[in-house]
Amino acid sequence: MSESPESAVNSQSLKSGYEFYLKGHALGREGRHEDALLAFSQALSLDPNLAIAWAGKGFALGKLGRYEEEIECCEKAISLDPYCVDAWNNKGFALGMLGRFQDKLECCERTLQIDPESATAWNNKGVALGMLGRFEAEIQCCDRALELRPRYLSAWVNRGYAFGKLKWFEEEIICYDRALRIYPFYFSALIKKGIALINLKRYTDAIDVLDRAHSIELGNAKALYLKGLCLSMLGKHEAAVDCLEQALEINSTIADAWVVMSNSCFMLGRLEESARAFDKAYYIDVKDVRSGLVKGLSLLKMGKFDDAIRSFSNVLGVLLR
């Protein structure tokens, strides 16, 4: 029995739509997210019911910082295919980027109901738990992710982060070293290892690690600030001020950098500069407190109590700086 002309046209559209989806997926893997977004949109113009293309479009939008739109695309994918793991994972990621960690946790749970062997979902669940202050549970999730995918860089780093929040700094460093053994140029792992070494008061070792990080990402304000902090703690205040000035020229909103700058200038007898730096830090803190309180109250009204508590805790951290 021959295929009807109408059926043949629909079959060709579906094939072409899926081909554009594959193109978008490949472009996304190359980091070409604008081009990937266009390819996914072309796929959906040919086949609006292709759930994985909606999930792919959402992923591309998320990579471009358009998280609300990512959520909309993922919800469309889920309406077409409630078992689309990519859509649930991507929606959870976007919710996390918007600070909605309780909602992210629920997405991860739904993903794991569909696919209990999803390393990505276990890792994402760990992140959500960690952001809600449940660090031991985060470690357990990362352990499960690493059982499924032993070379999962993000899971090693997130596991280290959780150990750090529990003040188990030696264990934290071991995790970052495992990640760096897999990929020596992992900037985030180097920065976090530097912070762990600072917490252990190993300032010279931290400087070596932060210099490696800076060689990978030249002009990174955080790497420069942390190096400046180490130099200040070692009593090398002239060098600290030079480093902090570079950091603040790149990003003048790092309140902690202004605090360290104020301290080093004071130790050098540069009292006017010390006072100006302290004023800068105070001004930034006031804005952070105000925005944190507004966000926390908004989350309370939405019934997102765990996320609200986290926001208020961040405010308290600023006030106790």
Go through the PLM ranges and name each one:
Residues 283, 297-321:
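TPR/TPR-like (Sel1-like) alpha-helical repeat modules
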Residues 18-29, 52-63, 86-97, 120-131, ...:
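Conserved alpha-helical positions within TPR/SEL1-like repeat arrays
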Residues 2-19:
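TPR-adjacent "capping" and linker segments in tetratricopeptide-repeat scaffold/adaptor proteins
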Residues 42-45, 76-79, 112-113, 144-147, ...:
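Conserved structural position within tetratricopeptide repeats
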